[in-house]
Amino acid sequence: MPIITLPDGTKKEFSGSITIADIASDIGPGLASAAIAGKVNQDLVDISIPIDYDAEIKIITAKDKEGVEIIRHSFAHLIGHAVKQLYPDAKMAIGPIIEDGFYYDISYSKTFTPEDLARIEERIKDLIKLNYDVVVEIVSRDKALNTFKDRNEPYKVEIINNIPEGETIKLYKHQEYIDMCRGPHVPNTKHLNSFKLMRVSGAYWRGDSDNEMLQRIYGTAWANKKDLKAYINRLEEAEKRDHRKIGKKMDLFHTQEEAPGMVFWHPNGWSIYQVLEKYIRDVLNNNYYQEVKTPQAVDRSLWEKSGHWDKFKDDMFTTTSENREYAIKPMNCPCHIQIFNQGLKSYRDLPIRLAEFGSCHRNEPSGALHGLMRVRNFVQDDAHIFCTEAQVQSEVSNFIDLVFEVYKSFGFNEIIIKLSTRPKKRVGSEFIWDKSEKALSEALNSKGLDWSYLPGEGAFYGPKIEFSLKDCLNRVWQCGTIQVDFSMPSRLEAKYIDEKGEKKEPVMLHRAILGSFERFIGILIENYAGNFPVWLAPVQIIVMGITDRNSSCCESLTTKLINKGYRVKLDLRNEKIGFKIREHTLNRIPYLLIIGDKEEKEGKIAVRTREGNDMGSISLEEFLVILNKSISLKGRFD
């Protein structure tokens, strides 16, 4: 007789085998109607799976995060059901969930059009209205194989052929349509009501460009229509904030086919880049980092010694000269060890913090490239700290402070922290991993920070802390990281002399705050919608005259401001002042300075902001107080 323990600690004893559906019904009709799956001893199961043993149970509904994911997965199967009804010759591949949605990869002789997408969506709605039961059946591998052979589904057959013999497989039956999945799925289509098909794109089978190009139908699904509407609104706002559109409108940068994944920075965009670089350089200097510069191309032998060649050679750009093969560096760490290795180091010299604005190249797939967010050439705010084991925790603790200081300067106050622990494939002893993970966790705990584990997601050479920003649309961007590395110093023979006069390998901490300048600027463009804080704005001030008579005074003011180090432009076009104000407001310039006969006579300037605030006529000295305060705040809006 199974004894079931509920989340509140209540225990219920049942006379025989039961299901999640039975337990939900025993608790009450409301829960029975809302239940879509269950969690049995932390494992998600369908509500119809029998339980004949003692277990801790949680009923999953659409209010749970897992419930929404199950709903999305079930919608992927509904795509399959609808497509097979409308296009019987289509062959179904895979249909997993992704962030905020799901997709299904399909092989079909004709290209799906927007009209086809609308037709599929309508058929899904018709199927939902039928309120049919989704039936799960656990079958042998051979039965599953024969099922999909009979249904002429070659991709399903290929998947099953890669499953070991003797394994069982779950089949999910949507009336006449059958799919396979680990599950769980909703028990009835009545739980599926808030969705939208988003788009169709191409995708290679198994992500391999040597395989067939399939058609991928993307969709999103939510627990209710309110959440769906909120998501669509966020997408529309994100579309307006697309850094590629704003970048073009503000003349910040462009990319082109002749240099895929490489950024052409325009003067306005390069201005932002330079301000960002100067700020980070000042922060590093204030925290006792030493800036270095290492070569772009390094002989293959160094990458083989470091271990990067075996793991990343397909992602490297290479070149040959005089019968030697070089890799354009994809990261900076092996080169920083070469600098550390020049000259004998003592424990008294540690920690040594080497920083570089390192230009790196990685051969990302062309289909993955996306404006500034995913590029092939990028600059990291990279640094490596060489320290003793005893110094690891304090160095990590100091870096955490640094990360929060920098992010706050851009207005990011909500930081998500995760500690990635040892993966299955790793180097180093369990003792070293225990010590490394403990040092990172204690550094986080000493700050009183909320954080969570990412089990098994550490690098092969050591655990890491990841810092992610949440932007104004509640999107999460992983940017900063600090990683403990006991492996590379050993591989590349880094040594220092310890207190006993013996040679010892330093611990190496890999760390970055922004991640890459390109991606971080892309994040800033979208977060600010191009309305950069004054300290970052490409043009901080525009000076305009009302008539030609005011040109000389405008030129003099512009020169004064430029000489004081501000970024200023002069507009003496023969246009109406209202037209110029509107144009420069749309161009997101923070301060608009206007000089007419009255201002010139009184020795004042009329000041307007891009938000439309008319600050009246004030002296230059008064304006500079306002301007300097705005700049000093950086992006700290709190």
From Swiss-Prot:
SMART domains: tRNA_SAD. It holds the Pfam family tRNA_SAD. Residues 1-61 form the TGS domain. Its main location: cytoplasm. Residues 242-533 are annotated as: Catalytic. One of its GO terms (cellular component) is cytosol. It comes from the Bacteria. Coiled coil: none annotated. InterPro entries: aa-tRNA-synt_IIb, aa-tRNA-synth_II, aa-tRNA-synth_II/BPL/LPL, Anticodon-bd, Anticodon-bd_dom_sf, Beta-grasp_dom_sf, TGS, TGS-like. It is found in: Cytoplasm. Zn(2+) binds at residues 333, 384, 510. One of its GO terms (biological process) is threonyl-tRNA aminoacylation. Belongs to the class-II aminoacyl-tRNA synthetase family. This is Threonine--tRNA ligase.
